[in-house]
UniProtKB/Swiss-Prot annotation:
A GO-annotated cellular component: membrane
Name of protein: Transmembrane protein 35B
Keyword hit for Cytoplasm: no
Transmembrane portions of the chain: 62-82, 85-105, 111-131
Pfam family name, one: DoxX_2
Organism name: Rattus norvegicus (Rat)
């Protein structure tokens, strides 16, 4: 199970590193223009808009790109604590992406990548939690007097 969790973590990390880099660096002119147009739409329905904050689309794209790039890298090569933090940040980012697509009333096929990534990140998070708690709860040596067994 640990090998499959490691493989999932590395694959997700590489995926988010590449998508973050694509948002930050011009891959090609048509792709960059399409991404700019998308982030203009995304900025219009930004979740904190109800509180009076609406980001600049270019800054929004850069912030999401850096978050994906750094969190993806940390997911692959970071220490366990930073892997966990980056996983949580990516979960929050994907929840925001799904929210944005729902508000924009996009087609179902547009939701699929965000929902799949969110599901895989949640699976990784819950499995890592189970592995940590299973290791912490396991007691190899019986302690005399523990759990109601009187000492003799």
């Amino acid at each position: 199970m640990l090998v499959s969790l490691g493989a999932l973590r590395v694959l997700l990390g590489i995926f988010f590193t590449l998508t973050g880099a694509a948002k930050l660096f011009q891959v090609s002119a048509p792709v960059s223009q399409q991404m700019k147009a998308l982030f203009e739409q995304f900025a219009e329905v930004f979740p904190l808009k109800v509180l009076g904050y609406q980001p600049d689309p270019i800054s929004y794209q850069a912030a999401v790109g850096w978050l994906e790039l750094l969190a993806g890298l940390l997911l692959v090569v970071g220490p366990p604590v930073l892997q966990q933090i980056s996983n949580v940040l990516l979960i929050l980012l994907m929840m925001g992406a799904v929210f944005t697509l729902v508000v924009l009333e996009e087609s179902l096929s547009t939701y699929i990548p965000a929902v799949v990534c969110l599901g895989l990140l949640l699976l990784l998070d819950s499995c890592q939690f189970l592995v940590r708690t299973k290791g912490a709860v396991r007691c190899r040596n019986k302690i005399p007097g523990a759990l109601g067994n009187p000492r003799k």
